[in-house]
Amino acid sequence: MWFKQVTPFRVFELPEKRYLDESLGNSWFTEPQGLDWFSEGFTHPTAFSDTAVFGAEKTMLIALKREEKVLPSEAIKYKLDEQIIKIQANEGRNVGRKEKQELRETIIDDLLPKALIKSSRTYGLFAGEWLFVDTANRRKAENLLTKLREALGGLPAQQPLTRQSPSALMTNWLLQGEAQGRFMLDFDVTLVG
């Protein structure tokens, strides 16, 4: 598995595989129930693994699964407009803002158990003193770290502090035609953003 974009965290106390597996097993993913908008928890990081942690060499792979219920706003608006037309036709009165909001909440409560589900996974890889999260989205990376901290009862970790952002540094390498340190440039590049 290749990570496409990475958010790194320096981990100061790496948990042991057995303890990590046991702790994440206690924070296992369950599907969103009833009126829940979403649910998240840890799951198998690979299709062939039956544990919460997949270990290889000196690395450990984990996965946080999130399922969100999706209710299109057009569907809610359509049902709300239907209800308002019925009230206006049957009772001969206009519907106020407060009553509209109550009707809207009732419609959402009725539709939520039947809503479509959007599923996603965020992967994390412990390697040495680092946790690499497979996302460039800071909020998703922090969410995985928060869930790890909740499951483990704490995990001292922080993002590395740099003098220059990695994207600006690598762009300069391309402009100069030469990389610094132990890096070297190849012939292909994909610029994003």
What do the predicted segments below correspond to?
Residues 1-50, 59-71, 75-103, 112-114, ...:
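Terminal interaction module
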Residues 147-153:
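Short, surface-exposed basic-aromatic patches at helix termini and helix-loop junctions that form
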Residues 106:
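C-terminal extracytoplasmic interaction modules
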